């Protein structure tokens, strides 16, 4: 699980992320759709998936908002994301592999925006955090 | 695998910006730190337990360069990647006994190193092209497993 050192590193870089959550969220999603186009099947109702799409911007804010909540509740990510897990598990029926793909795209966005801060140690801490998020999202699937 | 002119140009443009020994070493460093179980294949390299130890380990730099040199060959032979990696695939299966999942992990680390080097220049489209390149290499390396 997350060590005290991990939590410090996660909160530290997230402080920088919080200054531009919408931009980073949009970038992560655009990277997801370009690199892993199969993920677009869950967004037929968006019609426009370009970086200027209003719906995409709104969704990016929702996603990053949930991640920020998780960062603020690192000791209880499972409960924090319970309702979001239910939506993905029962309503949206999103294949969980997509959480890993979006996680990777978010890490690429962080590495591109915060090159000097995204050290191997910070990379490890964020990767561990996103794994906890993925587990929490999968919690209500079956 | 079909490569468009844009993809070919994108691959070459990014490649020209890279310092191969640096990128190779940094990708392996992230692999060993973020996915520490991958060190199982490198017991002969000595201490790989921390960023500091890995950074000063000449065997890591040497191996990183080996990997990047092979990737260079792939980049300059995009239409023959399967053949190019035939022997290396056999070696990883029969001799080195490497779980192919490790190829995917190293690919993820390499893309992240590219992001730290290129910043905004690693646009979603550029990333997509390099993800495609690495997935083709990974498939070629996994091909002779049976």
UniProtKB/Swiss-Prot annotation, chain A:
GO CC annotations, alphabetized = blood microparticle; haptoglobin-hemoglobin complex; hemoglobin complex
SUPFAM superfamilies annotated for this entry? Answer: Globin-like
This one is known as Hemoglobin subunit alpha
Q: Which organism is it from?
A: Latimeria chalumnae (Coelacanth)
Q: Where does heme b bind?
A: 88
Q: Which function does this protein serve? A: Involved in oxygen transport from the lung to the various peripheral tissues.
Q: Which InterPro entries match?
A: Globin (IPR000971), Globin-like_sf (IPR009050), Globin/Proto (IPR012292), Hemoglobin_a-typ (IPR002338), Hemoglobin_oxygen_transport (IPR050056)
Provide the residue positions that the database annotates as binding O2. Answer: 59
UniProtKB/Swiss-Prot annotation, chain B:
Q: What PROSITE patterns has UniProt attached to this entry?
A: GLOBIN
Q: Does the keyword Heme apply?
A: yes
| Tissues where this protein is expressed | Red blood cells.
Q: Does the keyword Transport apply?
A: yes
Question: Looking at the record's lineage, which domain of life comes first?
Answer: Eukaryota
Question: Which positions fall inside the Globin domain?
Answer: 2-146
Kindly list the biological process annotations in GO that this record carries: hydrogen peroxide catabolic process
Q: What SUPFAM superfamilies is this protein classified in?
A: Globin-like
Q: Name one GO molecular function term.
A: peroxidase activity
Enumerate the residues binding heme b.
63, 92
Q: How does it assemble?
A: Heterotetramer of two alpha chains and two beta chains (an easy dimerization is also reported).
As for family, the record states:
Belongs to the globin family.
The name of this protein is Hemoglobin subunit beta
């Amino acid at each position: 699980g997350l060590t005290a050192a991990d939590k410090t590193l996660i909160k530290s870089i997230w402080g920088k992320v919080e200054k531009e959550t919408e931009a980073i969220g949009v970038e992560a999603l655009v990277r997801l759709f370009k690199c892993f186009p199969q993920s677009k099947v869950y967004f037929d109702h968006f019609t426009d998936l370009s970086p200027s799409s209003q719906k995409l911007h709104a969704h990016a804010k929702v996603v990053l908002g949930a991640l920020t909540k998780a960062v603020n509740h690192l000791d209880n990510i499972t409960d924090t994301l319970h309702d979001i897990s239910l939506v993905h598990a029962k309503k949206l029926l999103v294949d969980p592999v997509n959480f890993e793909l979006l996680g990777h795209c978010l890490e690429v966005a962080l590495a591109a925006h915060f090159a000097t801060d995204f050290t191997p140690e910070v990379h490890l801490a964020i990767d561990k955090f996103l794994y906890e998020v993925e587990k929490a999202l999968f919690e209500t699937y079956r | 695998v079909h490569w468009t002119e844009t993809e070919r140009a994108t691959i070459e443009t990014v490649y020209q910006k890279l310092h191969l020994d640096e990128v190779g070493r940094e990708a392996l460093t992230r692999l060993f730190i973020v996915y520490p179980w991958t060190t199982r294949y490198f017991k002969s390299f000595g201490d790989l337990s921390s960023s500091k130890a890995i950074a000063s380990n000449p065997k890591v730099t040497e191996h990183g360069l080996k990997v990047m040199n092979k990737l260079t060959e792939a980049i300059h032979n995009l239409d023959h990647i399967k053949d190019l990696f035939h022997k290396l695939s056999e070696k990883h299966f029969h001799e080195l006994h490497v779980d192919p999942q490790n190829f995917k992990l190293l690919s993820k680390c390499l893309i992240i190193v590219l992001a730290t080097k290129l910043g905004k220049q690693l646009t979603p489209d550029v990333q997509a092209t390099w993800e495609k390149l690495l997935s083709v290499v990974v498939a070629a390396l996994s091909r002779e497993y049976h």
